[in-house]
């Protein structure tokens, strides 16, 4: 191939091709048409000779490359050129003569590739056949291991079953021995009973009817007490109904205190009749009946229905939570309206209501403890040796929650508020304005102590870290302040879980700037009747004496 290439490089036709093209280009304008055509044909003939030599060199080069080399180059570059560039017959003959070796080379390469593929498939099949026995052997060993493990597991389970059978046999023997001993003891008891039956048993026969009669008498006494309570309730309701029907409306304009005084007179008559009937029916068990002062105001009196004990704890809890929520949303706002007529500062009003709520819970819990002690003393003689004594005490308390002396608790709360240094204000204002609110909170707190577990309010102190789990900030708070300035409403807790969130006011730096030395507060004497004007402002000056400084933290 190298010799042919050297001959082509030194051939006259290849060397004179460039010179002829240059001469033709220079003489093209002066030559005639025939002369130009002759020049062009001469160049084509010379180029054809060069191409024939190049194809010979191409064939030799492809043969030197072997079966696989140069195939892609010929396919991608030479074949498209041959299809588009040469259309004349003479050139076609030359191409056919030169292309045949290339086609033979392509055919040989295809045959070679197919033979290589067949050899590869055959080698793969031989390797699979060789690896199949080893795979079968591995499967056999694995199945043998599984069989051995199953055998060991079955042996272990068999041993466990045998051990369990032995234990059951031992238990059966012990039970048989116990049964034999029981039969022997029963036979001995029968023999003793038969011996004792021969003795006179008049005394024993006389004791049994006495026990039955005493039980019937206790049951009859309880029924009579319930009947007396219900009859007193009925008579009180009938009397109040007759009074309301006999009372005619006045033609003139009524004063602002008319409806409130009328409601208080009705509640006073009802409470008086109920307390009188209960003191009559429970004279043996209750030594002190409820006091009925002229200023007694009962916010919500619940009838002592016998079905009260049957009410589930969940239903009572839901009702009390609803009452507590109503007290926050309605009764608290009413109390604020009353106090705002006398006090300008909203902070002082909210502090007064919060302290009243805390004191009411504290006093109600103390009253519940004393009430439970009295119930225990009363029920002890009739439940001696019984296992359900605590259940009986709880049922009695739930059934007789209306025996709670709420007015006495209201008086105690007002006394505690009078000596609290945080809410000292001018003497023209009296805490008797909050009697209805305090009485409602006391009744709610007293009833919450009868739940299982009881509900209580969370401890709160000014300056404590704000807890989002217990309180929500009021609308006028600084939402970036970390400390509580003062509390608006306490949080309701069940053990350590928050049932209802309270409300607190947070202000950054306000707690330290408003701290002032604690002054001695002036105690307020509490009279049964609170003289007030239209808005609860006292028109009669009352004597006040200095009292010692008390701890300002909330009591629980």
Swiss-Prot record:
Q: Where is the composition biased (Low complexity)?
A: 113-126, 284-294
On tissue specificity, the annotation reads: High expressed in testis and weakly expressed in lung, intestine, and spleen. Not expressed in spermatogonia, spermatocytes, and round spematids in adult testis but specifically detected in elongated spermatids.
Where is composition skewed (Basic residues) in this entry?
A: 257-283
**One of the record's GO cellular component terms:** mitochondrial matrix
Coiled-coil residues are 152-184, 210-243
What GO MF annotations does this protein's record show? cardiolipin binding; identical protein binding; molecular condensate scaffold activity
UniProt entry keywords in alphabetical sequence: Coiled coil, Cytoplasm, Developmental protein, Lipid-binding, Membrane, Mitochondrion, Mitochondrion outer membrane, Phosphoprotein
> Which first-to-last residue range defines the signal peptide?
none
Give me the ranges of the annotated region Interaction with YWHAG/14-3-3 protein gamma: 1-290
Predominant location of this chain?
Answer: cytoplasm
Residues bearing the modification Phosphoserine? 13, 85, 123, 127, 154, 157, 303, 305, 527, 541
BP terms from Gene Ontology:
mitochondrial protein catabolic process; mitophagy by internal vacuole formation; positive regulation of cardiolipin metabolic process; spermatogenesis
User: What ranges does the record give for the region Disordered, renumbered to this chain?
Assistant: 110-150, 171-214, 234-313
What InterPro entries does the annotation carry? MIEAP (IPR026169), MIEAP_C (IPR031981)
Q: Which stretches are tagged as biased composition: Polar residues?
A: 129-138
Q: Does the keyword Phosphoprotein apply?
A: yes
Does DNA-binding count among this protein's keywords?
A: no
- Could you tell me which PANTHER family the record lists for this protein? MITOCHONDRIA-EATING PROTEIN, MITOCHONDRIA-EATING PROTEIN-RELATED
Q: How does this chain assemble?
A: Interacts (via coiled-coil domains) with BNIP3L (via BH3 domain). Interacts (via coiled-coil domains) with BNIP3 (via BH3 domain). Interacts with YWHAG/14-3-3 protein gamma; a protein that also plays a role in MALM.
By sequence similarity, the record places it as follows: Belongs to the MIEAP family.
Entry protein name: Mitochondria-eating protein
Instruction: State the organism of origin.
Output: Rattus norvegicus
Classification from the root reads: Eukaryota, Metazoa, Chordata, Craniata, Vertebrata
Gene this chain is encoded by:
Spata18
């Amino acid at each position: 191939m190298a010799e042919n290439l050297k001959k082509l490089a030194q051939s006259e036709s290849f060397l004179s091709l460039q010179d002829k093209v240059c001469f033709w280009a220079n003489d093209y304008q002066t030559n005639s048409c025939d002369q130009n055509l002759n020049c062009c044909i001469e160049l084509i003939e010379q180029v054809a000779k060069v191409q024939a030599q190049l194809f010979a060199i191409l064939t030799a080069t492809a043969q030197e490359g072997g079966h696989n080399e140069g195939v892609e180059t010929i396919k991608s570059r030479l074949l498209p050129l041959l299809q588009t560039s040469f259309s004349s017959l003479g050139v076609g003959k030359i191409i056919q003569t030169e292309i045949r070796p290339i086609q033979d080379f392509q055919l040989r390469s295809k045959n070679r590739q197919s033979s290589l593929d067949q050899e590869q498939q055959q080698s793969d099949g031989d390797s699979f056949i060789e690896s199949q026995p080893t795979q079968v052997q591995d499967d056999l060993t694995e199945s043998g291991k599984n069989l051995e493990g199953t055998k060991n597991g079955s042996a272990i389970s068999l041993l466990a079953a045998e051990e369990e059978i032995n234990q059951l046999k031992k238990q059966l023997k012990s039970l048989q021995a116990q049964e034999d001993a029981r039969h022997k003891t029963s036979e001995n008891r029968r023999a003793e009973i038969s011996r004792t039956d021969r003795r006179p048993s008049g005394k024993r026969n006389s004791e049994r009817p006495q026990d039955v009669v005493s039980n019937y008498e206790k049951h009859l006494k309880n029924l009579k007490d319930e009947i007396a309570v219900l009859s007193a309730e009925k008579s009180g309701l009938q009397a109040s109904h007759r009074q309301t029907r006999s009372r005619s409306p006045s033609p003139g304009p009524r004063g602002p205190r008319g409806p409130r005084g009328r409601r208080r007179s009705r509640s006073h008559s009802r409470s008086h009749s109920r307390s009188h009937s209960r003191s009559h029916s429970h004279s043996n068990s209750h030594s002190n009946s409820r006091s009925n002062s002229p200023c007694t105001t009962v916010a919500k009196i619940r009838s002592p229905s016998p079905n009260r004990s049957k009410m589930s704890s969940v239903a009572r809890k839901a009702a009390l939570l609803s009452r507590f929520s109503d007290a926050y949303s309605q009764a608290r706002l009413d109390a604020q309206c009353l106090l705002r007529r006398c006090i300008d500062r909203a902070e002082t009003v909210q502090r007064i209501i919060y302290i009243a709520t805390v004191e009411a819970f504290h006093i109600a819990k103390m009253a519940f403890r004393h009430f439970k002690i009295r119930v225990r003393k009363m029920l002890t003689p009739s439940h001696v040796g019984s296992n359900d004594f605590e259940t009986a005490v709880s049922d009695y308390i739930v059934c007789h929650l209306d025996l709670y002396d709420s007015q006495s608790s209201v008086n105690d709360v007002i006394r505690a508020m009078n000596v609290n240094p945080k809410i000292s204000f001018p003497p023209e204002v009296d805490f008797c304005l909050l009697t209805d609110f305090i009485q409602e909170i006391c009744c709610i707190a007293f009833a919450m102590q009868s739940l299982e577990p009881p509900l209580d309010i969370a401890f709160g102190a000014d300056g404590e870290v704000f807890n989002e789990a217990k309180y929500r900030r009021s609308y006028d708070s600084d939402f970036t302040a970390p400390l509580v300035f003062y509390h608006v409403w306490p949080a309701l807790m069940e053990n350590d879980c928050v049932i209802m969130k309270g409300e607190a006011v947070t202000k950054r730096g306000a707690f330290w700037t408003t701290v002032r030395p604690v002054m001695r507060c002036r105690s307020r004497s509490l009279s049964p009747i609170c003289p007030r004007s239209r808005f609860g402002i006292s028109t009669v000056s009352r004597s006040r004496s200095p009292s010692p400084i008390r701890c300002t933290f909330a009591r629980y």
